[in-house]
Amino acid sequence: MKKIILSLLLVATTSAFAQSSFKGTLVSTDQKPISAANIILITLPDSTLVKGAISDAKGVFELPNTAEHKKIIIKITHLEYEPKILTPTQSQLGTIELTPATNQLGEVVLTARRPIIEQKGTRISTNVAQSSLQNLPRAEMLINFLPGVSTSYTGGGFEVFGKGNPIFFINNRRVRNLDDVYHLSPKDIESIELETQPGAEHDNSVGAVIYIKLKKKQGDGLSGSIENEEYFRKNGLHNNSWANLNYRSGKTDLFLNIGAYNNFKNHFYRNNELQTFTTPHQWRVTTNEVSDNNDKSAEVKVGFSHDFSDKHAIGASVWGGITPYSGHAYTQQETATYRNNAIIAKGLNEYDQFNQNKDLNANAYYEGKLTDKLKLQTDIDYIGQRSNNQTDLIEHNLLTSSAQKVHKHQEASSNWWNLKATFLQQIGKGALNYGTELSNQYRKETYNDNALTTPDIKNTEVRSAGFASWAYPLGKISTKVGLRYEYADFGYYENQQKSEVKSRIYRHWLPNVSVAFPWDKTQFTLSYVRKIKRPAFYELSDYSAYSSPFLYDRGNPYVIPQLNDEWTALATYGPISASLMYGHIRNAIHNDYSLSAINPNVIEKTIRNYDHYNLLKGVLNAQMQIGKWMPKLTLTYYKPFAKDVLPTSEAAFSAELMNQIALNDKWLVLALFNYVSKGTEREYYMYEQRSGVHLFVARMLFNQSLTIYGGVMDAFNQLNNHSEFRNPYIMSRQSKNYENYCIKVGIDYNFNTTQNRYKGHGVNN
């Protein structure tokens, strides 16, 4: 009878384990929580790995028990601690202490630590979870600490080894709104990989790809974060507020994001000097502008994701935003016109602008493992945009005491659909990545003012692409070859009539190839890619849009695509990485200025194809952890070989030094310095140096769930653009004072950070 009771108790206990989860907390010998440890469930006697989990920032983990009545053990591993094996007798494992992993060499103690930076082929990986980078208050700051990543001072955003703005993936899910990236908590990030040579599966305009891998987390319930930032400027105030909520139940996540962005009389200064050389006169127009921005914007995102199993997952999201929903921008512009150094006109122009954009984005995806060697990832995207831009301009002639009113009104609507399917198939030692991408766009635009006459514009665009890439290892050498074919049918309509001159059909083959190999302790990658830049619909228009009394904007229907053959060498040695890129650009598309054919007293800004030229860009990055200090230095050299092609071809140099100092677990100091020399940026010459100093202090509270930070940005207000364009007839100088100097204060609170709505795995995993 006792044996029967004992057997029943064992069966009941085993059943209870099979239906529950093992929970525990990992701490070090000094009782500090251990994050990013691997907790593995193993069945005996076959030593089969059944389930895995990772401890969070508090050292807490939850390991689902799916062993189905088998004998089990739990193995805990961490790069900095000795492995530990447990034979569980109950689901609550309590507090588990791990011993540091050390190798004793006399009196020297070596602690095991994974390198922060590693290069694998064309990718450079940063181990965020095992470095002090996870303590940064914001993901935006973290991205700036990635190797080869620097702030872009031309188009905003980031550059990766000088290759322009990258695109982002979170757990191999493409995100089109950077706010999704900026609002991630660095503590939730396991690692980040930089793909310096995107393959054929990406649009050729993509210069680099940043893959963010989040920590695997378990647990049901509500989680989220609340964030707020205040920018106190010398003139004006800017405010950003966000709320991110996620609810998980089983294998389903529901999420909601809300953001608000407000400007209160933010000042912006701009000075222009435009000179025109004609026979027999020399004309010069100077302008000084002061703008106040008072716009208020808002955005909302909702969505869900669901895992049917470890092999199949779906998800969808909808994002909507209004920029702005209220608030006008006011500008006062003082002008003076000179002919042969004698003033002939003096004006005061007053602008009242309300440029509103309404955006609606949607995404749905499926990803699955169809067989052991075949994966599929499918995305359907929609982007809808509605814009309503109005400007009321009063032009005062101070010499004649007269005034002229100009009203500009532009409305546009656009609908864009995109379908992309990507397959990844393992064939022996190699991997074949192939798929297709289809898109359709329809856009209408009306523009009118009481100074110029323009037609109603309609654009249609149908695109299709097929791509394939083959990766294969040859010993220690990794090779990858890819080919992408793109077809685009672009229709341009004016007043419902198709313009055959501006309508285009494009067909292009775009190859790429890369070879990666080690040499002693250095990892090298050599790559080649062909890229194309096609003119946008608005760049093909040949009507003039009123910008100011002396300047019109105009497209060019005769522009043809720009082709770029790009060769790159990338090398990584320990904490140092370097990139050298050489490009041959054909039919380069750049801005140009000329006299207007409509009004000889007006300058037209347009675009055109320039002759071929070559470009050299080198980037050197050094980054390491020195005790509590992590410095990162990025040096960039840019040199166009375009004499007699572009208006300028002088070299440019930039340096960026970032410093993170972790005083302890609660205090963090950031010191950022950057410098940009005079030199060429595209077709412009930057005639003034730029530099910036940024200092921040962050304080973590409540076991790092609450972060308060503050500091000064651009302490000396030196990150302002001073550009110049010259040709035989025109000299245009522009000075922009962004009033970057400000005091920035922020607060970020994360609660129940055990859920993760980005649950995809992606075809590349």
Question: Where are the regions that the model predicts?
Answer:
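Short, acidic Ser/Thr/Gly-rich low-complexity loop/linker segments typical of extracellular
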Residues: P45-V60
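N-terminal periplasmic accessory domains that precede
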Residues: S91-L98, E107, A139-L142, G157-E159, ...
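Short, acidic, small-residue-rich periplasmic hinge/interaction motif at the N-terminus
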Residues: I40-I42, K75-Y81, L93-S132, K163, ...
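Short acidic/polar hinge/loop motifs at secondary-structure boundaries
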Residues: P64, R173-G199
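Outer-membrane beta-barrel signature, preferentially recognizing the C-terminal barrel domain
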Residues: N459-E461, V501-R504, I532-R586, I603-L616, ...
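Face-selective signature of the C-terminal outer-membrane beta-barrel domain
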Residues: S297-Y325, N349-N495, P518-Q523, S577-A578, ...
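Extracytoplasmic beta-strand/coil segments of soluble accessory domains associated
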Residues: E140-R173
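Outer membrane beta-barrel strand-and-loop segments of large Gram-negative receptors
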Residues: W416-K420, R463-F467, I560, E566, ...
